[in-house]
């Protein structure tokens, strides 16, 4: 939507997010205030290790849900980037706790469904933010870093990634 008087443009995916919540039966879930709670210590060790567990998890729409979250993240919801990046690491063999984390992200979206990206206002300022962790990936002990650039109050291209590691050898 657009507010000409305030010189602002708002981008929203409220309808899309509501459809996603319905598709995964989370439209009546209790909302949470963070994209991914600290009690989630996700690891490949939580992936199914036997055929019964794998069969049970094959009935869970994990990949579809993560794909839906990725679309929202890329278009208008950079606030879920870290959480979506975390759950996407387990797409090849998700376990029950990984699915619980995906549902947590959906609960967060349920509580923030009306959030919008806002561009514009009086001063077109440029702001940058960054964050990182040290060995936050339980399985690989890799670190993660990310940044967000805002222009005129709205997020513009952002990135979260594992840093590139270089090894020097002397011959």
What are these regions (language model features)?
Residues 1-171:
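Long, low-complexity, charge-biased intrinsically disordered regions
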């Amino acid at each position: 939507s657009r507010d000409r008087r305030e010189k602002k443009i708002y981008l929203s995916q409220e309808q899309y997010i509501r459809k996603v919540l319905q598709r995964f039966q989370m439209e009546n879930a209790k909302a949470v205030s963070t994209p991914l709670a600290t009690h989630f210590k996700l690891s490949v060790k939580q992936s199914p290790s036997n055929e019964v567990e794998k069969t049970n998890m094959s009935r869970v729409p994990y990949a579809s849900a993560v794909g839906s979250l990725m679309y929202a993240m890329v278009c208008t919801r950079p606030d879920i980037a870290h959480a979506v990046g975390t759950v996407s690491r387990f797409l090849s063999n998700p376990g029950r706790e990984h699915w619980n984390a995906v549902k947590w992200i959906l609960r967060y979206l349920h509580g923030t469904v009306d959030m919008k990206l806002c561009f514009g206002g009086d001063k077109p300022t440029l702001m940058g933010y960054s964050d990182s962790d040290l060995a936050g990936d339980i399985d690989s002990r890799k670190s993660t870093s990310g940044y967000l650039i805002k222009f005129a109050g709205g997020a513009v291209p952002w990135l979260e990634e594992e840093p590139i590691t270089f090894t020097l050898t002397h011959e």
